[in-house]
Amino acid sequence: MTDPFTSDGAKMPPKPFTIEAGRRQVRSFVLRQGRFTSAQQRAFDELWPRFGLEYLGTPRDLAATFGRDTHKVLEIGFGNGAALRFAAQQDPSRDYIGIEVHAPGVGRLLNALEEDGSTHVRLYHHDAVEVLEHEIADGALDEVRIYFPDPWHKKRHNKRRLIQPAFAQLLVRKLRDGGRLHAATDWADYAEQMWDVLDATPGLVNRAGPRGHVERPAWRPQTHFETRGQKLGHGVWDLVYDRDPGVGSGDA
């Protein structure tokens, strides 16, 4: 089946995950058919070769990718790209990798990166779990950021939430000793699950203490999702964890 065209003629990019025959996998996202504009199509056509990383399923040499050997920050599910763009503008000394499965957001950020003249940002349009498992080496990341992941608020859908024990263990493996994990949510129930999972994960130490959270750090701007949540009366929880150098990646 071919991908659908939007009303202005732009064609959606291929599905951002691999499909294994005979295997049904629970994913933390659903691809919703949103508006994909001609400007976003142009971004994929013209800017993807500069900023995009094609998923190959094999370990990637990030130093070669960026042309320098410095710390790497990964943002999973960057949405419209506002937080990633802000961070890259404020911190040119580190390299930034963004992962997002929804094509309109990727196209929007591609255009923004061109406008900024960014040279230290690369993007995946792919499933974050597959990227981490197959393309990111253990200990390669200085920091992982996960801002307002889908809360899957219906109880029967909780298994789709991104923050699960196996995923947390995967993050520990990919973070360098002394690295940092920063997660934010505006759903109290999801914050509770994050604490349940992350506080219990060997190799992660909650910077605010058990079941603690911090004020929004300066490196995270107030996002669209946060603003929307506050209008609905939601609180916001920023959870910051340090990668304990006393726990090896094989122990996670």
Swiss-Prot record:
Chain sites annotated for binding S-adenosyl-L-methionine: 75, 100, 127, 150
EC number: 2.1.1.33
Region span, Interaction with RNA: 156-161
Entry-linked InterPro entries: SAM-dependent_MTases_sf, tRNA_(Gua-N-7)_MeTrfase_Trmb, tRNA_methyltr_TrmB_bact
Pathway(s) of this molecule: tRNA modification; N(7)-methylguanine-tRNA biosynthesis
CDD domains cross-referenced by the UniProt entry: AdoMet_MTases
Binding site for substrate: 154, 186, 223-226
Record has S-adenosyl-L-methionine as a keyword: yes
The entry's keywords: Methyltransferase, S-adenosyl-L-methionine, Transferase, tRNA processing
Gene Ontology molecular-function annotations: tRNA (guanine(46)-N7)-methyltransferase activity
GO cellular component labels: tRNA methyltransferase complex
Active-site residues, as the UniProt record annotates them: 150
Substrates-to-products reaction catalysed: guanosine(46) in tRNA + S-adenosyl-L-methionine = N(7)-methylguanosine(46) in tRNA + S-adenosyl-L-homocysteine
Stated role: Catalyzes the formation of N(7)-methylguanine at position 46 (m7G46) in tRNA.
Family in the record: Belongs to the class I-like SAM-binding methyltransferase superfamily. TrmB family.
Xref: NCBIfam families: tRNA (guanosine(46)-N7)-methyltransferase TrmB
Protein name: tRNA (guanine-N(7)-)-methyltransferase
Organism, scientific name: Xanthomonas oryzae pv. oryzae (strain KACC10331 / KXO85)
